[in-house]
Amino acid sequence: MKTAFVCDSTLQVNEEFCKNYPLSIVPLEVRLDDELYEDNVTITPEEFYKKINSGMKPSTSQPSVGKILEVYENLKAQGFERIVAFTVTSKLSGTYSSFTQASELIEGIDIKIIDTLQVARIVGCAVEKIIKDFSNGNLAYENIEDECHKLLKQQNILVTIENMDFLYAGGRLTKTQFLLSNLLNILPIITIKDGILDVSGKHRGMSKVLTKICEEIKEKDPKSLIILYTTDDLLKKAQDVVAKTFGNIETETIIISPVIGTHGGPRAVGIGYLEYEK
């Protein structure tokens, strides 16, 4: 059966990959004051961070059910008989719910929706591997969901944020945490656990935090790393610590998407790791 794949824009699948495989991206939306943009479509990450640094206030929304339904209908019209869709964690976004609602409004095509319970480019890596393995005949359709969750258990991301204003505004920090962080320059190590944000540690200063992140990751014996960043200076700091800790390890770099940047703000950097070969 002819099979297509769909995912939302926060998973940051490589654009070139989409040109070579039947994968459609549904963009989430970012609002800056009164202007609405499509994530990585009508606004780039660089433009987004420039705007919020100028004082514009960001907010996000999941794609509309109608927009997702249109993607499904277009794939059906192209002759696809099955769709496998991957979404950002349902515990931090309503995207999974929107994908599910849209699937209930179309007939004549089988749709499987997978809640990845993770975020950002590390999920995109798992999605790319699954699609490649399926397309090459190395992964059966009925095993896709199990394989996805297997891969997702072998990866994660650890992020730190210098400016807590956005996390606090989004209700993800208490007032006490917010005040202490700003006063003492205590930065959190934030990761994803069971689909939600989890603080695995707190340290004073960016260099100390990045060192601790790399030490945690080194225990996982990763095959490759992904540095996610918002500014070039934070990227450089992360690269220096990675080189010192890991030496010559395959490392991808990618700027954090506008939707995720809405919550993390303009001063964030993270390191993701994969325990499997891409």
What label would you give each PLM region?
Residues 3-4, 10-24, 29-31, 35, ...:
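Mixed-charge interfacial surface used for oligomerization/domain docking
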Residues 36-85, 90-98, 104-105:
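Class I S-adenosyl-L-methionine
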